Amino acid sequence: MIPVVALVGRPNVGKSTLFNRLTRTRDALVADFPGLTRDRKYGRAEVEGREFICIDTGGIDGTEEGVETRMAEQSLLAIEEADVVLFMVDARAGLMPADIAIAKHLRSREKPTFLVANKTDGIDVDQAMADFWSLGLGDIYPIAASHGRGVTSLLEQALLPWVDEVNPQEEVDEDAEYWAKFEAEQNGEAEEEPEDDFNPQDLPIKLAIVGRPNVGKSTLTNRILGEDRVVVYDMPGTTRDSIYIPMQRDEREYVLIDTAGVRKRGKITDVVEKFSVIKTLQAIEDANVVLLVIDAREGISDQDLSLLGFILNSGRSLVIVVNKWDGLSQEVKEQVKETLDYRLGFIDFARVHFISALHGSGVGNLFESVREAYDSATRRVSTAMLTRIMNMAAEDHQPPLVRGRRVKLKYAHAGGYNPPIVVIHGNQVKDLPDSYKRYLMNYFRKSLDVMGTPIRIQFKEGENPFANKRNTLTPNQMRKRKRLIKHIKKSK
């Protein structure tokens, strides 16, 4: 299961700045997921191949009443649901009473905690950190989050070793061996399909059903299963946890993951329900294909788009399900379709199904799109095929000039699966404009007939073998150089 990292501390110690660096966003609000309390934001971070969910909390104001009574509720919950805590302090301001109170609370929870001293740029670090040793939280990691200084050391020395410990590579997925064989494909003949003893079709498809509360996720699960396996009640929040249910359909095995709804922020009052939001995100990370359920009567909300953003960032295959389609007039249906085209036009690769989970209409067609998305995400493509498609794309639309030179695309190969990753090697490819990168992505998608899954393009440039090297002069060149030096000295 993907680990959860919480950032806690007093106001204005730099939590959001570090959050933005870890999640690679410019504004913490971009990753503001509904279903959490007002000042709590979270996003997906990936560092050197390790993935984790990062939570940014509102500042904790420890006063004379004590941190237990004055600590913001969302920050307390972030500590509870996190696997590890990054406790941030302000090195410029020094040790404050609130820092002491927060440290006391963290020690009582016995959570793995790393003490991070921020704003260390331009000051004597050793002197600034001296007082913080009294907090009794072990080593102190000095950083300057606004400039990125020390963040790499924090990751390499503290966070990444911990992620490896709680989420070892061999436990990531049962099909890791299969994908490892895919990675080794490039060493063989380009067109030859290696003989594999293992096939992705032998694995059950993990199918997560996500959406806002009361959009009909559990009703859809029960309709698919043909039994009342999940509690259903016409009231938001009746599903408290992610439920894993194995099933078989059309001689294919599946694991259905019914999740709790992601609710509008500020409207969650039950502690148990707040915990379920993290489990929803973890279910998305664990799934192969995600069914995003939208209520046709309520339309697309910001919560739907936020959840959609997390699904896309995770690289999961996607099928959009518009539920409660029955009973709507033709005029309303046309309006809903226009809204979908307008707000979801950027994900034209995903199939959209209009269904009624309650009555079962349209549900049977979902699995055709699920299988199509899974097959697209796990399909194996040879280096020769990808290179041929790349060359056709370059012939149809030449790469632009960069600093007076034409960008050269050399070859392409598969860099990963689920989602499909195409790695393109060439000269100056990292300088390609975003418009041409999108063109290549769409060209590969159309040529490979990829449907239901995002496709990613990565660019790599070969190292210059003559970089940082000086030419060795021949004996004649050395003699000529000496004569020139003597001539210059005489002329002076």
Curated annotation (Swiss-Prot):
Keywords: GTP-binding, Nucleotide-binding, Repeat, Ribosome biogenesis
Superkingdom of origin: Bacteria
EngA-type G domain mapped to chain residues: 3-166, 205-378
InterPro entries: G_ENGA, GTP-bd, GTPase_Der, KH_dom-like, KH_dom-like_a/b, P-loop_NTPase, Small_GTP-bd
GO BP, one annotated term: ribosome biogenesis
Entry keyword Transcription: no
Signal sequence, renumbered to the chain: none
Keyword Membrane (UniProt): no
Residues that bind GTP 1: 9-16, 56-60, 118-121
Binding positions (GTP 2): 211-218, 258-262, 323-326
Molecular function terms, GO-annotated: GTP binding; ribosome binding
Residue ranges constituting the KH-like domain according to the UniProt record: 379-463
SUPFAM superfamilies: P-loop containing nucleoside triphosphate hydrolases
Family note: Belongs to the TRAFAC class TrmE-Era-EngA-EngB-Septin-like GTPase superfamily. EngA (Der) GTPase family.
Known role: GTPase that plays an essential role in the late steps of ribosome biogenesis.
UniProt-listed NCBIfam families: GTPase_EngA (TIGR03594), small_GTP (TIGR00231)
Subunit structure: Associates with the 50S ribosomal subunit.
Protein name listed in UniProt: GTPase Der
Organism: Klebsiella pneumoniae subsp. pneumoniae (strain ATCC 700721 / MGH 78578)
Lineage start: Bacteria, Pseudomonadati, Pseudomonadota, Gammaproteobacteria, Enterobacterales
